[in-house]
């Protein structure tokens, strides 16, 4: 969630948006995609709302901009309009093959904080790991982005002179697909959710009592916590096809990630009838604030959810620990080779455990001081304690920012009172 894309214009016509989805969608996959019945012109319907943003479009000065804080806002709609100089957002999609040997991650960005890494405020990162441990990475700085929100779903298109990337998500957030048409990367990905969208407190979307703020000024909603995913792309002229575990996240911040976060961990597992997700965030602003949450589903239904990370005799809790002694660790100073996720419900007298083993590095970034971020594809085994244990794919990601950095600086600013008409 997602570091894969974290570091690595002109208004376009409706016809250009519609034409951008020509990515050799496999014929047998059409049954997976419920939006085909809307017809080819659906995305130009008057029922849709269109957000267009080019690479250099930004609100100047300290004027108020829209920043989503309502937990009932459409998860896929833009969260910040227009951009200002401090905040940003991303749509992130990732996946791991069934054998844990391959992974992908797409990041669609509207974020001026990464203009230092390229041209403008738009960014697109596509990363893939291969079975031979090599990785394919493509980072683009598109000239335009368009997000179309309709009653049946959301489409985003990030375009440059000779490439385009598209994501589409159904309104019920159960199915998503990604397409890419670039000189060295073409193809598509489809994922079908096996767990409902969740907030930072683990509750299910929609929930008017929930909050999307996980730590101060940093907001997150796990739109597709876990999904069955299929990948069919061609990179550098070579086919790349597999199925496994996927997920999709929405993240938006009032300030840069470095300003808001000290560290973060994210895990997803799918084994047999079970799907488990764990996320934790450490605030860089409110020192000592640690916000974990864990959710477990069985046969697509949530059966366990908690934010408690210490053992209790009465309350549901989850304990997440690092393990060592395996074959695959990152190149940073942290050398964990896997993880253990244990969930306990004292009232139900039930316990579940999943052991995760890293199989390959999906992506990695060194940020200085021996820290940074690493995403692992892997395998997991687990289930209900004392009952049948299941095997399946896993995804694990850790991020830690250095305490001091010449590249990343805090961009926090105090808000101007709203009665003055400015932020």
UniProtKB/Swiss-Prot annotation:
The keyword NAD does not apply. One of its GO terms (molecular function) is isomerase activity. InterPro entries: DA_C. Transmembrane segments: none annotated. Disulfide bonds: none annotated. Pathway: Secondary metabolite biosynthesis. It is an enzyme of class 5 (isomerase). It holds the Pfam family DA_C. Glycans are attached at residues 84, 132. Its EC number is 5.5.1.-. Disruption phenotype: Abolishes the production of chaetoglobosin A. Induction: Expression is positively regulated by the cluster-specific transcription factor cheR that binds directly to an asymmetric direct repeat present in the promoter. Keywords: Glycoprotein, Isomerase, Signal. Residues 1-18 form the signal peptide. SUPFAM superfamilies: AttH-like (SSF159245). Belongs to the Diels-Alderase family. Diels-Alderase; part of the gene cluster that mediates the biosynthesis of chaetoglobosin A which has a unique inhibitory activity against actin polymerization in mammalian cells. Chaetoglobosin A and its intermediates are involved in the morphological differentiation of C.globosum. The first step of the pathway is the synthesis of prochaetoglobosin I via condensation of one acetyl-CoA, 8 malonyl-CoA, and a L-tryptophan molecule by the PKS-NRPS hybrid synthetase cheA, followed by reduction of backbone double bond to install desired geometry by the enoyl reductase cheB. This is Diels-Alderase cheD. The lineage of its organism: Eukaryota, Fungi, Dikarya, Ascomycota, Pezizomycotina. The gene is cheD.
